[in-house]
Amino acid sequence: MKNEIILITGASGCVGQYIANWLMENSSSELFLWVRDPKKITSINLKSPRVKVLVGDLRQPNKFKKELSEVNRVIHTATAWGDPKRTKEVNIDAVKNLLDLLNPSNVKQIIYFSTASILDRNLNLLPEAFKYGTEYIQTKAQCLTELESHNYQQKSSLFSQH
């Protein structure tokens, strides 16, 4: 049986590296690590036959069309903030484009990392996130809305951090 392929976006960040390390130690999955700068990955053996580094911008997913069609699970930790245009492009548009390139018959799970600032105490989306939140919070709320209406809705999980 072929090992599962797990895509981790933002794999050079703190959360992405932690997840990749955990998976290397606790699974036999192959990891596709999507990063802009592989030099920022300091805690993962990039020479492992189980690791494939995808170097590129999340806003240009067609570069990895073949790899994305093979993915079984997505752990989406990549994010942007600060520049409103880039924040929207990365946090909303790039996610939609990435989802469109996945092969629905292969995908078992999508884990979306976000912020607790978009949820109420019952884990429902806060309408205020759209109205009063920073562009970062607004784009995270919009992306969650998109995920909830996407074909992958039943396969998606939200992980929010404080």
Question: Could you say what each language-model-derived stretch is?
Answer:
Residues 5, 72-73, 109:
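Structural motif
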Residues 9, 34, 77-78, 110-116, ...:
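SDR active-site strand-loop-helix element
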Residues 27-39:
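Conserved glycine-rich Rossmann-like NAD(P)H-binding loop of the short-chain dehydrogenase/reductase
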Residues 47-97, 101, 119-127:
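NAD(P)H-binding glycine-rich loop region in Rossmannoid oxidoreductase-like domains
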Residues 7, 32, 54:
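Conserved Rossmann-like nucleotide-binding pocket used by diverse enzymes
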Residues 93-139, 157:
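Conserved Rossmann-fold NAD(P)-dependent oxidoreductase catalytic core, especially the SDR/UDP-sugar
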Residues 146-162:
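Conserved beta-loop-beta element that borders a ligand/cofactor-binding pocket
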Residues 4-29:
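N-terminal Rossmann NAD(P)H-binding glycine-rich loop of SDR-like oxidoreductase domains
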